[in-house]
Amino acid sequence: MKEFPKNYNFIESEKKWQKIWQEKQIYAYDENIAKDETFVVDTPPPTVSGQLHIGHVYSYTQTDFIVRFQRMMGKNIFYPMGFDDNGLPTERLVEKQRQVKAYNMGREEFINICNEVVASEEEKFRSLFNQIALSVDWNLEYQTISPLSRKISQMSFLDLVKKGEVYRNNQPILWDPVDGTALAQADIEDKEKTSFMNYITFKTEANDEFTIATTRPELLPACVAVFYHPDDKRYQHLAGKFAVTPLFNVKVPLLADPLVQQDKGTGLVMCCTFGDQTDITWWKTHNLPLNTIITKKGTIDFPHEIGIDGLKIKEARAKIIDILKEQELFVKQEEITQTVKCAERSGAPLEVLTVPQWFVKTISHKDELLKRANELNWHPKNMKIRLDNWINAISWDWCISRQRYFGVPFPVWYSKRIGEEGKILYADISQLPVDPLKDLPIGYSKYEVEPDLDVMDTWATSSVSPQLSTWGISDEFAVNKDRHGKLFPMDLRPQAHEIIRTWAFYTILKAHLHQNTLPWKNIMVSGWCLAEDRSKMSKSKGNVLVPEKLLEQYGSDVIRYWSANSKLGADTAYSEDVMKNGKRLVNKLWNAAKFVSQHFDKLSDEDKKTNLIDVKEKITHEFDQWIINKLVELVNNATNELQNYEYANAMHLTEKFFWSVFCDNYLEISKTRAYDEENKNPSGQYSSVLTLYHVMQTLLKLFAPFMPHITEELYQILYSENSIHIKGNWINYGNLNYKIDAKQPERLLEILDHVRKFKAEKNLSIKAEVQLLEVSGIELSKELTSDLKNVTSAKEVKFKPTNDEIKVSILT
């Protein structure tokens, strides 16, 4: 055993161990070990999109608790770290940091700037993840924009093309006019906004007036029909007739359709191409013409004497209303609250434009995906309903093309050869990764092709995050077929609940389409980290907690302790009180270890090296045997909780045992025997010290997944030069159980509790001498009576056997 330092300096200790763990490759994955002996994690690649915050620490450490446990259980661990450094989130960060706009500069120049920013931001993540002691193997690191990742992502695309699960079509899509790109259904959020319902006068061809209601009068030039409900008796006379649009005098059909809400507005609604998804449905169902007037920049494209061409949406709306009023065609306006579909990233209200895009078939697989969700092991189980609800709500195929720069390009060109103009040309797998702006399809010259200028949705690459680590999509599309077969499907996907509809869903979809399987066996879903007042953290509120400051103040182990106190899946508020409890626990571990260590020289070297099971006969005292039984029970329960991903329960059980059973009671009760200064009870002393030795060692191992630095420091001082975190270092006491009457030691604790309360009420020191301790209702064994006398400082203990409850009389 090493000399015990006087104090614990967490800053020095944490830096020291983080360096040693990396140097000794404690967390290295061994590719030569079989799959069934390996625990494979699909680690969330953090999005390189802004400031690091305590939420990163919160969710990533919860995964690490499980990984460290699995490693100590003997599993070979595949625990990579990736960086999701391509796509719109990164582009927005770059534009903000460098005060540039992608569209105002050359594509290559902007990509170079993105690469510079990404490299700097990723280094910050690495530093933080090392500080909080994530036990990842950094040799397995990947970036979603790296050549290998681009190759895997393009393989995924080509495999889906081959399977007929991807198509390109010129159809209505959701468009973000701020970021200038198409979006998928999962990229939008519904926002409640104040708006106005505008009542406008239309006429029939016969000059009969009627009123329609709309929130978007600026779309009048795009009106292609007017609809009413087939059961609405008010408008049956309009069947088969035509309306004439105000201001523009365009003849459009009056049609019946059950999607019309009779009680909304006047029950008459114009169909424009396009205001919303209902317009799309009507356009398709009734084979209506396409009349697009909104540009990709969110302005009006409608040269007309009315003068709205080039105006922004809101400007055009106001002008149309003014002109309608001038011509007495505007009936009234009502303020309403409506749900508006907005871009999740930019916050901009979305438009529906018709632009050629790439799509992954999704709607046709909804039933299959619901079955997949049911096959998956959910932790916690109640998170499954979120995926079920999302799948049931899907109404669009997944649009995977984005009109941006910094992303994975489509391995696609379009032929300009005479006779095959527009033919889609795909890269050969041997060419991947390709950049169609620089590379060419086999057999074509640069004058014969037009490159696809779009890049893939960042989720199109993130959705193959398991495959980015396994280096393969399928047996046919693989960089390393053997590696892919050994690692896929994976064991665990940890992630936050807000991206179930994106990352979880898309990854399940891709694995299902590629290999007809789930991507992992288990999904572990974390909640949000909230501010102390339980509000969502945001820069605007000024309540974002920066990890670096907390690490300086408390250290990594304390922050991890706070994270471990949050149940999986629960949204948890940051708590200064919990942090202080964590700091108190670290100090108590140090002091308890320091106390027990002074007795370890009383043990033989052989017994120190021997497993508890093999020295159990040397633990002879009844109270020592009782705590060993309790310890075995704790190990079994904590192990079971961790195997079920209930790390918070495991932490709670361990902490409660440490404070209540070990520190508050066992240490105090066994202390006199451990010292045995007069050598009155050598077997009792040896039993006590051997018990202290193994209980402390076991507690360090139980705490190790949660608080890796303090446990490593103490373990190496007291027990071994090998890391506490090495593979196979968990506790297994099998069926170890001492045949004792457990009620006897528990009665001892009950009596002790009475004495402590008595002394506290009399303002006596806990060590104050007791002349006579008289106990009725039970009689303790000779060994336990001796312990009771020692711990209560009682000169004499008398027992009065009765059938009554325990009563304690104390004479001081």
UniProtKB/Swiss-Prot annotation:
GO terms for molecular function: aminoacyl-tRNA deacylase activity; ATP binding; valine-tRNA ligase activity. PROSITE patterns: AA_TRNA_LIGASE_I (PS00178). Keywords: Aminoacyl-tRNA synthetase, ATP-binding, Cytoplasm, Ligase, Nucleotide-binding, Protein biosynthesis. A motif ('HIGH' region) lies at residues 46-56. Pfam families: Anticodon_1, tRNA-synt_1. It catalyses: tRNA(Val) + L-valine + ATP = L-valyl-tRNA(Val) + AMP + diphosphate. One of its GO terms (biological process) is valyl-tRNA aminoacylation. It is found in: Cytoplasm. A motif ('KMSKS' region) lies at residues 536-540. ATP binds at K539. GO terms for cellular component: cytosol. Catalyzes the attachment of valine to tRNA(Val). As ValRS can inadvertently accommodate and process structurally similar amino acids such as threonine, to avoid such errors, it has a 'posttransfer' editing activity that hydrolyzes mischarged Thr-tRNA(Val) in a tRNA-dependent manner. Monomer. Belongs to the class-I aminoacyl-tRNA synthetase family. ValS type 2 subfamily. This is Valine--tRNA ligase.
